[in-house]
From Swiss-Prot:
Domain of life: Bacteria
Name of the protein this chain belongs to: HTH-type transcriptional regulator MhqR
Origin species: Bacillus subtilis (strain 168)
Induction and repression of expression: Repressed by 2-methylhydroquinone (2-MHQ), diamide and catechol stress. Not subject to autorepression.
GO molecular function term, any single one: DNA binding
Amino acid sequence: MTEKSLKLFIVLSRAYRSINDHMNKHIHKHGLNPTEFAVLELLYHKGDQPLQQIGDKILLASGSITYVVDKLEQKELLIRKASPTDRRVTFAQITEKGIGLLNDIFPDHAAEIDEMISVLSEEEVEMCTEMLKRVGLNAKQFHNK
């Protein structure tokens, strides 16, 4: 199984890189880098988030979060907001301008993803999703050891 596992790893890695490179170009067209997009996307879908937890949720070092939040704040795409219950906690909140930008990005973003995945049938997409989820959860166990 080792040879087949290695081949699958290489195929997955190359597919991820190709998709990711293409999507990053799409994001750059809107004046964002992938990390900025990830932060805005998190806030857009999950609401206000403590700065301390954003890094964990998008897999970014805490020192980098401050830099990214500063950049997004300069672009007026998010604001910092003090916690009403804990003075030590600061939240990031997406602004109307940020929401508008993501509303502009998402339709094309989703269409690009659909186009790349269109080589698979609906059933294949479901099977692939389930299998990759199992592999990811299994890999996570090794990471947590």
